[in-house]
Amino acid sequence: MVMQEEKKRQQPVTRRVRSFSESFKNLFRPPRSRDSSPINVTRIPYRSSSTSPKRSSEPPRRSTVSAQILDPKNSPIRQRSYTLKCCTPGLSHPFRQTGSGASNSPTRHRSISGEEQEIVNSLPEYKRSASHTFHGIRRPRSRSSSVSSCDSSNGTTSSSDSQWAMDSLLDDSDNDLTPYRGSNKDILKSKDRAPYNYIDDYNKKALRRATSYPNPLPSKQFYNERLYTRRSHPDEESLESLPRSAGADVQCIIEQNGFKVYEDGSHEHNIKLSGVIAKLEKGNSLPVHRQGLLSRPRLGITLSGLFKHHKNECDIENASSLLPNVEKSQTNHEKRTGQSPNDSNRSSPTQGREDYLKIVNPDASLGSDELKLINSLSSRIHKSLQNYLQEKNLKPAECIGEQAPTFQDNYGHPVGLVGAGAYGEVKLCARLRNEKDSPPFETYHDSKYIYYAVKELKPKPDSDLEKFCTKITSEFIIGHSLSHYHKNGKKPAPNILNVFDILEDSSSFIEVMEFCPAGDLYGMLVGKSKLKGRLHPLEADCFMKQLLHGVKFMHDHGIAHCDLKPENILFYPHGLLKICDFGTSSVFQTAWERRVHAQKGIIGSEPYVAPEEFVDGEYYDPRLIDCWSCGVVYITMILGHHLWKVASREKDMSYDEFYKEMQRKNQFRVFEELKHVNSELATNRKIALYRIFQWEPRKRISVGKLLDMQWMKSTNCCLIYDST
């Protein structure tokens, strides 16, 4: 018996290797025909919604396809994973194989034709294998130009040419030759090909045609001048937020509501631009009312955190800045050089004193310069508020007689209304570009205008002036320090909204910020009514990665946001994400502190608040509540609704069910049923979600560690982050 088994093992297994394209077609045949081949190659779970009604809710599959290969020699089933990677500069092909034993895994094959067999027969005997046919000849496939669209209801791929789209994802490099029928070599390199001097001219041309392959994709042109890629515009200026390079002739394999995924792994966001911006680009002049008052065209976007419209309007064009001139000059110098002009000669205001505080955390966003600015702003705002109470007019003595540039000089005129908050309106302002303006710009712009978002902060008659002053100062200082961070030669984060200036006019304070023309995440989800407020999983993953990078930047510099929600997440049309609204942010560590300050009490919006905030008198780490909020934001993007209204067992039945199910089964049904483009990404994401939604803060993962998990590492993001 032993001898017979050894003989069976030594006998060559003659079987026809099924190509992946054939396996894909077999998915649409009756189930009986799928197991007819000795090797059963199965796509998991690339199925059309029309043929697989049970899995109609699955989202489209993008790049990674797992194949289960039933080998008669080895049992149990071996798992092969073919993963699509983004093409880096200099690589001629973007496809690689990863996973256990990927280098020896079967690849795409086909039978050779009679004409090709004649070429092989003309070769000398020593160039032909005694037991195998010729290795690796294949014709170039014809590539379809159709786009594989997605079902708007469930995101599944449905196209007559979906076989080509899926087959292209599984091909090896076009520069390699694949083995055929049990070859002893995995890949036949060019040096092993038959010499041409043994073939006549006719066969030379035939062999050349048989072994010719489509031209490789042009290498991507990455712009690494900053932390992320840039898109070239006709005027040779660039918006630094584009995921794909121009000129890459690649096929779109997934398209859903403007979001496109290409066969090289890249993707493209196409978020709707504001209607008023399009009108301004066509016009020759700005629609400005007399005396600079706001004309009434409304934006075609929503910034939902800025809720109501106020009746009283104010003239802001003559507003003057509250920032000291020294601060402005230092900021401009830091923007150019990355360091303060007087770093070597500057002395601390408390230097020489016994209680001089030593800087132990140089990366902290709140340092000595910010402390000086806080004191200066607080003093000027207090004086202005006193004048406002007495004369109902903001005219501080420091501003009278100064010939500093006005609001109109720096930021132009109001041209639209964005929304309104608790303390006033938010307006869109624009000014014409001039010769002094040079890229890169820190806000949205086109060939004619530069745009700014202007937030009005006006005290109410019954408001606490001390609280109002603290809110204005903290919101501006935190946003300004994060968006203009140049300490230790580091650049600002691309996912933090720029805050430029704070001014005052006759009746209010004015904060000037970067304008994001695509609105906020809340408006984006509400606008996707056909998809029930859901985003494609790949698009949501990209946004999640950008959000985590922005939050990590804040945490690395001693600040927690504490109010992360879709209303506070803004976008550019090409998918660049910006975190805004630092009014409730917490400074948990300054430049003079080693320890992290804990806090207590409820901060933020209830659906996004972590459960430990509802415990009376309990102190918590503000960084961990940001991580919880990021998880809730992601689930909202995927499901189109909240998991619960409030993370409290006593107040919300949905959260109580989540708590009980996790206690009883150690899993949550909603997380288990979430679909992704393939099982590997779905599993990695599910593991990360369980790490995020831990009601015990000590068990919850941090934002930095979450970015290091396999889910985020395998996520293709349209920004390129500096690894340092």
Curated annotation (Swiss-Prot):
Keyword terms, alphabetized: ATP-binding, Cytoplasm, Kinase, Nucleotide-binding, Phosphoprotein, Serine/threonine-protein kinase, Transferase
Signal peptide: none
Enzyme Commission code: 2.7.11.1
Assigned GO CC terms: cytosol
Low complexity biased stretches: 45-54, 143-162
Phosphoserine modified-residue sites: S19, S232, S238, S241
Domain of life: Eukaryota
PROSITE patterns per UniProt: PROTEIN_KINASE_DOM (PS50011), PROTEIN_KINASE_ST (PS00108)
Biased composition (Polar residues): 95-106, 318-329, 338-351
Full protein name: Probable serine/threonine-protein kinase KKQ8
